[in-house]
């Protein structure tokens, strides 16, 4: 099973987004559904086990969440996994990309 999970500073996300905590999670969960992912719980999303898993996760992570300023400033931990093994630390990838673009 492929997926992603993260821990969010809910109060910070709420403040930066101008939404309530419930609205923040509803927004994120809707983005996951639009990327055809399974919402396991707030902050944990699984792919459906088909040929589009990797692309659906990439859409959710990089095309959706990565582009939301209040999200990237509020996320505490963020990992992508495969069969319950951590594959990538998304925060490390984001920081590396930011460092590259600022050169």
Which residue stretches match the model-derived regions?
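Basic nucleic-acid-binding interfaces
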Residues: 2-8, 13-103
